């Protein structure tokens, strides 16, 4: 008697290609782009050029957009990059420029995915959007803090997520706090960027300051979790990726 036909078992799809990286600068936007094919890197660069030009044009029409630290009313005809920045800033209660780097990262990765990428990372000065078909370790740079060389393991996923970092002791970005690193995790990368800014602003010095800093973002829909490093103290809230050791050096950072 013949054996019944068996349904073929689909083998898990292997990640394709060895990742390549490219450093790309367009005026103040300085990014590191990672993908498995150069065409995806070009897609990211094209998106950055396009959305940055749109943003610059909008700022010329309303310079207040660039300088306000307060929530901003969204015009009906605002372009997508501007809308995302406004929505993120308003959700957190701060200005739209708090979300500029994360928004550009997200739009670039979206363009890479549209081109077919399953592995795509854009690091815009510590504000990172990614989609990955293999585990990825993202290092957290914490300046002179004794808590260093920490990495976060992002397991394979088929949708874009983000980790954005703010610091008061590292880098040129505006921060009113004393965090060596304040990182926020969200699938809304614009929101993660604005939230990291607010979290970093809230961090003072000492253990108690780290503990109470999370009030700046706790309870905001869309935020998965956060991590703060300040001096010899580290605090975590919410759902975080697995923490591991990583080789985190200053020269590895995409400086914006």
UniProtKB/Swiss-Prot annotation:
Signal peptide feature range: none
Gene3D superfamilies: ApbE-like domains
InterPro entries in alphabetical order: ApbE-like_sf, MA1715-like, UPF0280
Family in the record: Belongs to the UPF0280 family.
NCBIfam families, per database record: PRK04334.1-4 (NF003324)
The protein, known as: UPF0280 protein MM_2648
